[in-house]
Amino acid sequence: MKKLFLIFVAVSPRFTSFAQVNVLDASTIPATLKENAHSVKREEKIDFEVKDIDAARLSVHQVYTVLDAEGNDALDFFEYSTAFRKLEDAEIKVYDAHGKFINKYKLKEMLAEAFDQALVEDGKYYRFRVTAPAYPITVQYDYEVKYKGTLMYPDFDIAEPDQSVESSIYTATVPADIDLRYLSRNINLTPAISTQGKNKIYRWSVTNLPATEDEEGTAQDNSICPQVLIAPNKFSMDDNNGDLTSWKSFGLWYGSLARNANNLSDDTKKRLQTMVSGASNDKEKMKIIYNYLQRNFRYVSIQLGIGGFKPFDAAFVDQKKYGDCKALSNYMQACLSAVGITSYQALIRAEYNSEPVDPAFPKNWFDHVILCVPSNKDTIWLECTSNTTDFGVLGNFTENKKALLITNDGGVLVSTPKSTASENKFNSTTKIVLNDDASGESETDIKTTGEYKQELMHFVMNENKDDQQKYLVSRLGFLQPDELVFTKDLKNDSSEMAFKLAVEKVPEFTAGSKMFLSPRIYKIWSSRIPGDDKRKYDFYFPCPFIKTDTTIYQLPEDYTVENLPRPRDEKFEYGFYKTNYSYNESNNTITTIASLQLNQNVIPAEKYQYIRKFFGGVIEEYTEKIVIRKK
């Protein structure tokens, strides 16, 4: 068997030509590559050739065998095409478990979705999902991309989580006077380097690589999987040449793009100056203009780089009343400048669990733009794309990250602030009147700050009633209501919500004259913490937080308490959980109080077992029951 396998590896460069002799048969995959794998990368050949400082071409050939439904991500084709990165051709071939050809799809058969053409020239997404009638199934992708702009060299993404690799080769050809840099992560891999005329050729090769087991709750996949990051030394983008060997030089290049994009008409400047004329300090001026931006401008969600890096002129945004992240941040910067306030744009990699930027490897890690107003005492950070975020608050989308500040002297890598538990609060108070027939009517008041305020506004203020009800039941864990009535105008104070529920059955169950009630109507924590016995990577919560709940049961007149759960007071390194239960005989009410606090949202892998045990106890406590009975 070993000899057969060695022969197979030797001929793998001609892999696809042997489909007729069943080399694509899933049974030929070595058993070691099926362990912990839901898909296998059978063959991959990536050729990236830099023609000049502003031009390159990418050719990709990939063959995947998907072993089961959990590997279906490998059946998705997704590429974008713009004036800077044109998808010239693509083809998909599908084979069954035995390597028999099933179907073929061309680029014209794929779903094409256009970007906003005002923001992305010739911009389209191309998508295609291969349907698996059975498993295993093999899919082959072949596509060509032409680059007009060379800031973003394609990385060598060797494997996804739960994916093994039979053969993968990445070849990069680059003029020696431009050259490239590389950084291997989660794998010890160095390239073979050769020269051919004026070009340097880098060749990375991987064979028979076992799957990396996925771990829920990690940073994004690229941070745990084998990968080679690749970046140019010199590049051109948006018709501007740049140097990427340092953060300073990268910042100088980006700053040059926006240098002449801060134009506002005299009328607009006067309007802004009048708007802030009553403000007593710069912070008040910033807040007034930020609120103006939120009320009057719309964000178009386009990731930084897809439509280029040059922001649209502030005058364009002022007229159109919309823009992407770089356009709105540039506009806000121009508005602040019009009232005498200096600010700096900052490039950042967004999402609470995005892979951290490596300070030692200058590269375009970034996909978003925010704004920074520096101060010795009180630096203000502004998220210019949100219509709901409070002034000076970033939220978990961009907090606690490395950002590239674009100053007049070039780029400076800085850290954005991080929120504390006390800045992300969720407090609920519910009074429920329980009837003899086990039905009930409840009134709930919810108060939020920080990340929970943003969530509340997103799911409740801006959704229809069915979605609102789904949020209350599925996300917050309230009982399924027969009737839902909001008793507070959400738009008056978006940090609070009040509503009434009519519920046909309040108890978890009844037995004879007894009712068994949950400790509280709102599930203060219900998310499962995955069971990794030997965790390798840090675990990410969306944010640190404080959650409190008070539930008051008004019992039927002829009922009394038989049993209350014992109070809890659980503490661990990163937080605590406390509960208390009391019965007031004079008014026949049960009051339950719970408090849950998490002080840090990134938990080191070596501490994971403690947090899993802690939150497991929180969920377990909810299974305890309040027992009431007829007198």
Report residues per predicted region.
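A sensor for short, sequence-defined functional sites
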Residues: 20-631
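Bacterial Sec-dependent N-terminal signal peptides
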Residues: 1-23
